[in-house]
Amino acid sequence: MANLGSNQGATKPMTFEQIKTDQIDRVAIVTLNRPEVLNALSLQLVRELDEFVTDAEQDDSIGAIIITGAGDRAFSAGADIHENRENNDEQRAAGAAARADYTWHLAASTKPIIGAVNGLCYGGGTVMATSLDFLMGSEKSSFRFLAVNYGQLNATWSLPTMVGWPKAKELLYSGREVFADEAYHIGLINHLVPSGELMDRTVEVAAGIAKNRSEGVANIKSLLIEHTGNDLETQFWTEIEGRKERFKGLSVEDGFKDFLNRKGRKPRVS
């Protein structure tokens, strides 16, 4: 594969702490860079990703974006539960608002965004993944839509557009794991390739899109969103509002009790 550090055509250097950014010709590559915690989505990471996409939308040298995870274990294990647990109610509300904004930003971005799912993709990781235009995967890819296990709502607006309503219901109701072969057969991932070829193949597919006129791709994407269920954005924000109303007052300890007990983490005392 071409040198990921080339940054050919980038309009300006950008420095981040929790994501890495590279560019190959007209394809930008964003790596979620917290492998020590399976690329858990901290608020800082989410904001950095949102900032990068905002900048990329104004960059004529970028025709497509790829998002992947650092390391060989995970695309993303989901939200950073421990960070959320240690925040107060005001911080959690601000974090939830920021996550909602960035998720819709990814879904509606004027640039096509492809996910290269290099490992497990759980919880909030699946929310991010299903908000992208489409996904590439390997034999290491696996998915779990875990919101139901914590009494939460996620991906009700996005997953049905990828796999259809009956399959989406099964996966959202059960929270069971979906391995690579099944993910490919149900349409959750578009291409299933050997793990050693995943990034090469994803760059190849992205380059095939990026060579086209950016405004043409953006117009197609915008119209597809408009046509999906008539108003996909309304479906998205209905889920966000439903989350607020249905789970008002639910503490992190209550919502993620099994996870926190399994990890054996104690609350941080300040």
Question: Where would I find each of the regions flagged by the language model?
Answer:
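Conserved CoA-thioester-binding segment of acyl-CoA-metabolizing enzymes
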Residues: 2-68
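C-terminal alpha-helix plus adjacent terminal tail
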Residues: 2-25, 59, 72, 175-180, ...
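Glycine- (often His-adjacent) and acidic-residue-rich active-site loop
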Residues: 69-105, 121, 267
